[in-house]
Amino acid sequence: FSFNTLNLRLGKATGDTLNSAIRAKIEELKSEDRIGTMQFFKCTLVMVEEVGGKDIPFSAITVEWLQKCEKLWSKTRSVSTIGMHMRNIRTLMNEAKRAGVIKESQYPFGKGLFEIKTSIGRKKGLTKKQLKAIFDYKSENETTNRYKDLWIFIYLCNGINPTDMLKLKFSDIVDGEICFVRQKTERTTKNRKEIRATISVQMQAVIDKWGNKPLSDNYIFPYMKGNETAIEAKAITRDVVKRINKRMKLIGEELGIGNITTYTARHSYATV
């Protein structure tokens, strides 16, 4: 993303506004199939326009203006959500500063200026005892068992992101290990790292019960076809996560554990 790209895409007549910069960023992310981030920047655009309208010059982005945003947004949004949108704004302000659109003295973020608040997140990992209760849990409802098993697979497969799980193919299995690169890091050479997860007996049981036929070109799980657009794939993933979370919430309540989500599985892998 650059302001040269912005000017070419939107034309200099639009002027240097936060709105046009966000729209350019959205187009860039869409072209890179980074749909989740694209949708988040769309939300940022809606939120800043709630406060400043459709034509917000970069010169208007002051400490006071950001404080006004924070105060308004805090009525309906969490500290962590506000923080993520503020970081989107900061990203574009950094680009504006580098491009000479704003002066250093106009930059509103930093110590003694506007500081983005961070929430103190409670730990969402489960204990070994709680995990055992989930593993041992059996329902009379087949759908509940299906999504519980997918949750277990996420946990056992190194806390795999559901996006990555649904893209796994049988060709990703090499010598008893599942090998994959996290979607969030595959575009960067610096952080790009292949993850290997040994297929345990329990993981294999989940694959055998709920997976596709074990052919090299097949996805392991029957959700993606391979011809989806990035937006369609994102929608499928969101739907599967929603279904897992719905069933795991019921299981958590029944076991007295509380709300359980796919994030709980991922965090538990990292902490247990």
Protein language model regions, located:
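N-terminal DNA-binding module of tyrosine recombinases/phage integrases
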Residues: 1-46
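N-terminal core-binding DNA-recognition domain of tyrosine recombinases/integrases
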Residues: 23-36, 45-122, 136-137
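Major-groove DNA-contacting interfaces characterized by cationic-aromatic clusters
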Residues: 119-120, 204-246
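Conserved tyrosine-mediated DNA breakage-rejoining catalytic core shared by Y-recombinases
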Residues: 111-112, 167-209
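Short, basic (Lys/Arg/His-rich) helix/loop patches that form interaction surfaces
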Residues: 242-272
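Basic, Lys/Arg- and aromatic-enriched nucleic-acid-binding interface segment
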Residues: 83, 106-162, 166
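Short, charged phosphate-coordinating catalytic segments
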Residues: 94-104, 154-177
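Short, basic/aromatic-rich helical patch in the C-terminal catalytic core of site-specific tyrosine
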Residues: 66, 89, 153-154, 158, ...
